[in-house]
Regions:
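A structural-propensity feature for long, helix-poor, extended segments
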Residues: 17-53
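Composition-driven recognition of glycine/serine/threonine/acidic- and proline-rich low-complexity segments
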Residues: 11, 16-17
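A conserved C-terminal secondary-structure "cap"
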Residues: 38, 51, 55-132
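Conserved beta-strand segments that form the floor/walls of ligand-binding pockets within enzyme
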Residues: 9, 21, 27, 65, ...
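Single conserved hydrophobic/aromatic residue that forms the stacking wall/gate
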Residues: 1-10
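Residues within well-formed alpha-helices
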Residues: 5, 45, 80-84
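Short, conserved beta-strand edge motifs with alternating hydrophobic and charged residues
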Residues: 4, 29, 65-67
Length: 132
């Protein structure tokens, strides 16, 4: 089960595009139970997303993959949410191709991930274009 889920989630940042927009792994929410499907599928999909982000900053990783459903992305407004959805799609493709080319690839060093994320999103952010 872990291996199947592993293939659906983007657990590692292999490069700076991922690190520029999302700090850490892009999580994969669990499958809804039959009871959750029967008693409010849409509401419970949202509940499972919230559950997935317990103890995490949802704005540091503004996306989630819902197993057997698909991606969700958000932002401070609709334009940023769409931008984050596009980034998610590109990062997913890059991770897939990277793992196909080199299955034992190592993630980018944490210091590189930190530099790329915090220079755009940290308290002293100085780099990158703001989504307007």
């Amino acid at each position: 089960e872990y291996r199947r889920q592993r293939q659906m989630c983007i657990r590692d940042s292999y490069g700076t595009t991922h690190a520029d927009y999302m700090y850490g792994e892009i999580p994969c929410a669990r499958v809804l139970t039959q009871e959750e499907i029967d008693a409010g599928y849409e509401k419970n999909t949202g509940t499972v997303i919230i559950e997935t982000f317990e103890g995490k900053d949802p704005m540091a990783v503004p996306a989630v993959l819902c197993k057997n459903h698909g991606p969700f992305a958000w932002g401070k407004d609709a334009k940023e949410a769409v931008h984050n959805a596009v980034v998610l799609e590109e990062v997913a493709k890059m991770a897939l191709f990277t793992e196909q080319l080199k299955p034992d690839v190592e993630p980018a060093p944490q210091r590189i991930q930190d530099k790329h994320y915090y220079r755009k999103h940290g308290a002293n952010a100085y780099y990158g274009n703001k989504v307007e």
